[in-house]
């Protein structure tokens, strides 16, 4: 309800200005990843093709088509292999077919202007054994030592360079099952030299190893930023939609994630076919578009740069007559902001640009493009 409270405060003020990231992110966890072989009953019943053919020829094609229609930029988070090798000496060479799948999907992601981030060497979260984490029920194995974790991370670095070359940098990490603790963060910072952001989840309960995040620089590991996701899945859900708008009202961005295997998981698919789910997924995107059409689609790394740009920004403002004077401290580069104005409207602005995006009674909200340290907004009736 923080978003509601934030807007309630704004509504009660003569004017209220806040910087926003103005970004729309779409994460695909477990992509690229090894594609399951053989048949799956959910897929076979509807499409009569093998699992690998379905994901290569149908699912990914549909995702690209939706992305083209809705101007989505995907950030994919790679898994090298679905094994339980959580000890340094057990990490064997992956198969040529797995290498082919990773290469094809990764290169198609790049061709679609997407970003490659890290999900893991395998899908075992970077956690030590702990009584409060039920590894057995989750079908996970705890890591033995930091040396073992480091070996897994270096496997990712090795395969990414082999598949895509030295110029591909890994800026963003998504923890498997959104589970992560200090021991894992230490290894991430040490062994991913280009890492800038960790993206887990914003809503949820911080228990059982789940990594719940607030937006901002990580206080223990200040070289990385916490930029959580606010929604997930392919299905349309009113509670998820509320969560999206509530988070936007505070932070000014939308970050959503899904997994390719959501559609063959009974709970994550809600027993719906891919034909139904792809329509519901697009409905989610359209719903957000209709309310927030100004959000800019981008890669995860690009939003991280936007956050870095405004993290130290301080805004002061005062009103004299029909002018609002805004002064910025620690201004670096142009950024977006929202301003709510009650009982007046903007006539013009001394620099940058403005666009009215919402009206309710005597209150108007504008999207500002702020380009200088000091600006004046001229109001009228």
Q: How would you label these PLM feature ranges?
A:
Residues 327-347, 377:
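Surface-exposed beta-strand/loop patches in extracellular or lumenal glycoproteins
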Residues 189-235:
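His/Asp/Glu-enriched short active-site or ligand-binding loop at hydrolase and phosphoryl-transfer sites
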Residues 34-56, 131-144, 265-290:
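A solvent-exposed, charged loop/short amphipathic helix patch at secondary-structure junctions
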Residues 359-381:
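C-terminal beta-strand-rich structural cap/linker in extracellular carbohydrate-active enzymes
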Residues 1-42, 56, 60, 91-92, ...:
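Non-catalytic propeptide/linker segments at domain boundaries
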Residues 97-107, 205-215, 233-245:
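Alpha-helical scaffolding within the catalytic cores
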Residues 34-36, 68-183, 204-205, 260-264:
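Metal-dependent polysaccharide deacetylase catalytic core of the NodB/CE4 family, i.e.
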Residues 8-36, 67-69, 154, 161-172, ...:
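Catalytic grooves of carbohydrate-active enzymes
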């Amino acid at each position: 309800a923080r978003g509601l409270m934030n807007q309630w405060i704004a509504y009660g003020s003569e004017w209220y200005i806040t910087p926003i990231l103005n970004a729309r992110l779409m994460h695909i966890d477990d992509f690229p990843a090894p594609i399951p072989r053989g048949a799956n009953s959910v897929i076979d019943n509807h499409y009569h093709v093998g699992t690998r053919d379905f994901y290569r020829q149908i699912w990914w094609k549909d995702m690209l088509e939706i992305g083209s229609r809705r101007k989505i930029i995907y950030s994919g988070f790679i898994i090298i292999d679905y094994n339980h090798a959580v000890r340094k000496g057990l990490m064997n060479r992956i198969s040529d077919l797995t290498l082919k799948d990773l290469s094809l999907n990764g290169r198609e992601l790049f061709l679609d202007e997407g970003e490659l981030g890290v999900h893991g060497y395998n899908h075992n979260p970077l956690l030590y054994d702990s009584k409060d984490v039920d590894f057995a029920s989750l079908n996970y194995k705890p890591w033995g030592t930091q040396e073992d974790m480091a070996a897994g991370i270096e496997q990712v670095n090795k395969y990414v360079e082999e598949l895509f070359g030295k110029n591909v940098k890994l800026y963003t990490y998504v923890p498997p099952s959104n589970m992560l603790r200090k021991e894992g963060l230490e290894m991430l910072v040490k062994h991913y030299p280009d890492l800038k952001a960790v993206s887990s989840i914003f809503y949820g309960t911080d228990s059982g190893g789940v990594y719940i995040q607030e937006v901002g620089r990580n206080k223990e590991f200040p070289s990385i930023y916490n930029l959580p996701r606010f929604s997930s899945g392919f299905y349309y859900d009113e509670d998820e939609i509320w969560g999206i708008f509530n988070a936007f009202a505070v932070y000014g961005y939308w970050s959503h994630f899904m997994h390719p295997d959501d559609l063959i998981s009974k709970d994550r698919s809600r027993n719906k076919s891919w034909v139904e789910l792809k329509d519901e997924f697009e409905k989610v995107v359209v719903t957000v578009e209709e309310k927030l059409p100004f959000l800019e689609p981008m890669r995860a790394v690009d939003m991280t740069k936007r956050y870095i740009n405004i993290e130290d920004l301080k805004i002061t403002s005062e009103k004299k007559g029909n002018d609002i004077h805004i002064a910025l401290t620690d201004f670096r580069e142009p950024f977006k902001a929202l301003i709510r104005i009650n009982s007046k409207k903007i006539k013009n602005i001394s620099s940058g640009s403005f666009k009215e995006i919402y009206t309710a009674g005597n209150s108007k909200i504008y999207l500002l493009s702020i380009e200088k340290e000091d600006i004046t907004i001229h109001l009228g009736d």
